Amino acid sequence: MLNSAGYFLTDQASLALSTLIIEINERKESGVYDSDDIYSNFYEDMRSAETIKAFAAKYPCLYDIIFHNADERVQLITDCLRGMIGHKDEIMETFGFDCTQTGDLSISSGDSHNGGKKVVIVKGPSGTLVYKPHALAPELLFEKVRDIVMEKGKVKYSLDTAKVLSFGDYGFQEFIRQKPVSTEEEACRYYYRIGAFSAVFNALRCDDLHYENIVCAGERPYFVDLETLVKNNSKESDTKNYPPFLRDVLSTFEDSVLGTMMYPMNSSFVFFDFDMGGISGSPKQTSKKWKSYSLCNEGTDRICITSGEGRLSEANNLLYCNGKEVLPIYFAEEMIQGYQDAMNAVIASKAQIIDAMKSSEGTIRRVLRPTAMYGKFLQVASSPLYYRDKTARVKLFSKLYKGIDQSPREFSRVSCEVEALMNNDIPFFEQKINGKDIIANHNYTISDYNTSSPSDGVEQFIGKIDEDYIRRQTMLIRMSLASSYNSKAEGEVFGRELPREKLALDSDMTRAAEMIGEQLLSSALQAKESDSISWFTESLIDNIKLDVLDVKMYDGGGTVMLFLYLWKYTGREKWLRAAENVMSGAEELGYTKPKADVSFFTGAAGLVYLWYNFFALTGDTSYVDKIDSYLKECLVKMKESPDDIRDDIIAGAAGTLVALSRMNRQLRLDVIDEILEISAEHLADRFEKGETEAMTGFAHGYAGIALAFAEYGDYTGDERYTALAAKAVDMENKYFCEEEKNWKDLRDKGGFGSFWCHGAPGIGLARLMMKKLKGFENNETISEDILRGVHILLREGFASDMDHSLCHGTFGTMDMLLTYANAIGSSELRETAVSAAGRYMNEIEKEGFKAGIKGMSATPSGMTGITGVAYTLMRLAHPEMPALNSIEIPEIRRTDSGTAEHTDSEIYAFAVS
């Protein structure tokens, strides 16, 4: 029992810790103690009855909580021992644990509920046993559902669960120890089981299988806490004030396999800024939102509490082999296969599963707010201020009333939350699996809190599961696993390669592009109240995250362009509707709001480019009005934050100058001229002062800046910008290496790039576009740089380690080859691109798609995803299409009626000697 006694003392002391530190500092500052050893004096002082009495009078709330907590802990241990003695024979038979020979009792460090109840770990000579002070009906129900699924014979390996004994409102569970695997085969079976388990939990709408609830035991995962087995969100959602499409997106995410929390949780939809996923949550992560606290200078009068970056606690959820972590990302195919097999078994067992649910008399836990939110309140409430004054403590917790609807049910619910927090407990809500009421803190029922029961929700949800749902979930599993990729992590234990999604493509390039478009449409998020669509996708900010597709040109803008030009060249109206629906989805999700960022690939100029293409292809002049009014609002924001303007092609003024100068030759809008003038002055000022970042390359470096100056100089006739363009070329060419026939990459890693974004191909492309502009038509340096770009593109543009992306992959190489071919009239370069397309289409079918951000799924991103592949295939089939990475502008011929007629993209035709 020594362990429980030690915990007992530590538990009580932790409640008073911050208050005791305040006390010792107050006495130190007031000079109460003459001795130098202030800490020892304080320690002795706090042991006297008189001091304790005064302390209790000063902090009455703390005094009450400590004694209340002590009584609860004694009762908890008593209940545990009584349960063991009362059921010793069943415990021996089920677990082989001898209750007459008990050693230590350890109370878990987890949350306290329902009068201080916590999990207790009991150790003895015969093993270890887990006491749970709540019903284990969810575990028993899951076993029933698991058995039903396994009877179909579709799941290859057993899905073992921890043994349990349930006795009403408490029970006992087998203690599972973490074990490594010894072989790759065992790891494969482990991750197959993860996939299969995730399917069953997904079908039951379980949503709390985070890293603390999984234990790796060799090739078998065990789930040690299923109290939230079935989710019920039949009550009106907290997202009721959100835009309808955003509500639909969040609901789809919650009801997906990722809603179980088993897979990596790197997403913009989750409450935390670190990954709590069941198979991936690791204490190696740090948080910017959440803090960790530790004692410093213990045993001295300088004792204090310091805060640091929040970290996850140690757990047993990560799989190891020979001391190395077996990373789940490399076992995506095993997890997907397990998920598919088990979910197909679920589909075949729907009626039996629903019967099992309907016959259950058990309860499940309802999590009505994130537990971490309650924890934050208790953390604040541990301040001496809230220990002195009960009224202040009640006022603090009453902030939970803020923002709720005014119904009696919600007031009752929050009252129960406040009551639990006042007792230093995390509020605990339960619901019968076949009931609508919720029970708060084991002692108060709120009738008809929900409009349906958890089993009703499962019945409704499981009825919708079909092959299409399974396919969508496998895509999400891939995206989620991709978000866990860490290039700095230790290599894969068994030497595996990252798995890729395979796509079958027709040999006809237009048809192949259309097949990709059809796959995108089939996986789209569909609004319930409109025709709007979007997608889940992988975004890259600091790390890969799951997000909803934006229509920035670097991301979803390419998908809009693909659909528009599929409509142009196939004549199928569904593609025009699809393009319009993506745009309406972006508007509903708030992606089309005016912004100060008027860059091309990440800002407002890209959105204008999309509307421009709608105008060019449909002749609908309302798009011009939309552009005009939108940019006027952007201009206001731009003037409010002029220092936020960046420099480069991707996200800065250079992209703005190239895109808007070209479009305004056709649109002739005053607002564009004003934006161009501000952008040009900003970029010129920074360039002349040497403040632009010293980088080579088109996307982020001198090549893009040179093109921007040249474009604006040609547009305005201002020779200042033509001269600045020439200067930028000269600065970049200082870094040309004759030996490598390439420009040095000035980023940290150094080397020589061979991509659109970095290296000779993109630099040559920028020079190619400068060649037709005023002051550079007969420039020999420009002509020579173009040839250098083509040379490296042909020599290195199809390296074996390249991905398939448009930004820095093989399809970017093909796209640039086509642009070069169009410009110089080279059938040879075009044939090289077409031939390469055939090879890489076959590679995508046989080996899988290599995304541009180490993703494993065919996401709808234009520059890094499968959309870029489809768009490039369309360009190879129809070379007159505008190149996205060259910011080509379709020319518009105005008719006498004021409408527009579209002509093919302007071709930069000239000869290079």
Where are these regions (language model features)?
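CBM-like carbohydrate-recognition segments
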Residues: 805-807, 825-913
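Long, well-ordered core segments of solenoidal/helical folds
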Residues: 513-531, 574-594, 622-643, 674-692, ...
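Solvent-exposed loop and edge beta-strand segments that line ligand/cofactor-binding
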Residues: 539-557, 588-604, 639-653, 688-703, ...
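Hydrophobic residue at the +6 position relative to the catalytic HRD Asp in the kinase catalytic loop
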Residues: 212-214
